[in-house]
A protein has these predicted regions:
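Active-site-adjacent scaffolding segments
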Residues: 75-78, 116, 152, 166-172
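Clamp-loader machinery-focused feature within the broader ASCE/P-loop NTPase space
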Residues: 1-133
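Loop/turn-to-beta-strand initiation segments
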Residues: 117-121, 146-152
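Conserved catalytic/switch belt of AAA+ P-loop NTPases
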Residues: 136-150
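Charged, glycine-rich active-site and insertion segments that engage polyanionic ligands
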Residues: 1-48, 69, 111, 147-149, ...
Length: 437
């Protein structure tokens, strides 16, 4: 597909190209891991459908008024929804006067005629964050779509959507992107030099959107590095120190989320500008001034349930004596705490994976490039069996976070499950902290 911003998804791009050349379905779902380019691909499709070039094979041309309006986020017939507000959800909206950014407001917008008189495109970012009421309202539009409207749902996990919604959508699947492809892409955009592009491509783990966000925020990269080092340091810590450390790491993960979110818009804007050049015109509006992202890092869910699944519940007694949090520090909203927990969990799993790779002698495959020496040094002192058990526990706790288990309890369990180096494990219980290595 010519002039596509999306990289590393040849099969998905071929399917989108066929939609532009032929007749686009009234509803299509882009499914794949977060930050693999679903929103970027949706914008490529929107640019193609709203392009004014008379030759379908040349769309998107990236030169016409329509293409520039899509790139600048100002095309009047491109409508976007994204999670917002408490719980970070997409909501149905009030029945009488629905607020912008809700499904009912979108339905009202689509009841009007198109501004440009041609196709209209709806992009629902993080569609898995729609609550059931919003999905049922959207379902009516999927069953009886307005003429000329293509609805694109971007979802990390389609199982979060109602079966009736899924059944009315064509599927396009996206997977992780190769590290070399991400590295070249960052270089082409001019957002990072060659060494940094290579480092970020490894850190991203196949997610170009995440690499792009880090490229635009050295602060986010710095915070992530501090979190990674803190996790490695915990290998030598005792129980009480771990429970204190995980609280600080969670705060850092929340700061990382903020830094990444602040730059995702700039990241996708840079990618679009590289393909489309300077944007023209400021007319038109979107259904929601959604934050443009190449994919979400995490999928936070609403406030935690009181009952914890067995894995977390069984360790609750061990995790009980946690130091009280500083009352002067504002408590994060439930959705932000859950997002921070997911972010920390992801970095923790990456560190565990790298230690396992280092134990197998696979240095070139390590993702944490800045910690190569530390990881190689600590790998022989960590039990491979305990590491395998820990990585399995990460998967269990990740699922529990999706099921509304309390993030603080889940992270306490993980901290106590994190392997200890042999020296730390063999240290006397009453040994001074400075002598426990």
């Amino acid at each position: 597909m010519k002039n596509a911003v999306t990289r590393g998804q040849p099969r998905a791009l071929a399917e989108v190209e066929s939609m532009i050349l032929g007749r686009a379905p009234h509803a299509v779902m882009f499914v794949g891991p977060g930050s693999t380019g679903k929103t970027t691909l949706a914008l490529d499709l929107a640019a193609g459908l709203l392009c004014g070039d008379p030759d379908p094979g040349a769309r998107p041309c990236r030169e016409c008024r329509g293409c520039h309006q899509v790139a600048s986020g100002n095309h009047p017939d491109l409508h976007r929804l994204a999670p917002d507000g408490p719980g970070d959800q997409i909501r149905i909206g009030k029945a009488g006067d629905p607020e912008p950014g809700t499904v009912r407001h979108l339905i009202n917008e689509l009841a009007l005629l198109p501004v440009e008189g041609g196709a209209r495109v709806v992009i629902v970012e993080q569609a898995h964050r729609m609550n059931d009421d919003a999905q049922n309202a959207l379902l009516k539009m999927l069953e009886e779509p307005p003429a000329g409207v293509t609805i694109v749902l971007c979802a990390d996990d389609e199982e979060c959507l109602l079966p009736t919604v899924r059944s009315r959508c064509a599927r396009v699947r996206l997977g992780p992107v190769g590290g070399r492809e991400i590295e070249r892409w960052l270089g082409d955009l001019g957002v990072a030099d060659a060494p940094r592009s290579a480092r970020l491509a490894r850190l991203a783990g196949g997610r170009p959107g995440l690499a792009l966000a880090y490229a635009h925020s050295s602060e986010a990269e710095r915070i992530r590095g501090e979190i990674a080092r803190g996790i490695v340091d915990m290998l030598a810590q005792g129980r009480a120190a771990r429970l204190a450390s995980v609280r600080e790491l969670t705060k850092s993960a929340a700061a990382l989320d903020t830094a990444l979110d602040s730059w995702r818009s700039a990241g996708l804007a840079a990618a679009a500008a590289a393909a489309a050049g300077p944007a023209r015109g400021r007319n038109g509006k979107a259904t929601k001034a959604a934050t443009a992202s190449a994919g979400a890092l995490t999928a936070p869910v609403p406030a935690a349930a009181e009952d914890a699944p067995p894995v977390a519940a069984n360790a609750a007694q061990d995790a009980a004596p946690v130091a009280a949090e500083d009352a002067s520090v504002p408590r994060l909203a439930a959705a932000d705490r859950r997002s921070a927990a997911s972010t920390l969990l992801e970095i923790w799993a990456s560190i565990g994976r790298d230690i396992s790779v280092a134990q197998a002698g696979g240095g070139p495959q390590l993702r944490e490039v800045e910690l190569v020496d530390e990881l190689r040094a600590v790998a022989p002192a960590v039990s491979p069996a305990s590491l395998v058990s820990f990585l399995a526990r990460v998967g269990e706790i990740s699922n529990q976070l999706d099921e509304n288990v309390g993030p603080e309890l889940a992270l306490d369990v993980l901290a106590l499950s994190w392997p200890r180096t042999e020296a730390a494990a063999n240290a006397p219980a009453n040994a001074p902290a400075g002598h426990r290595r």
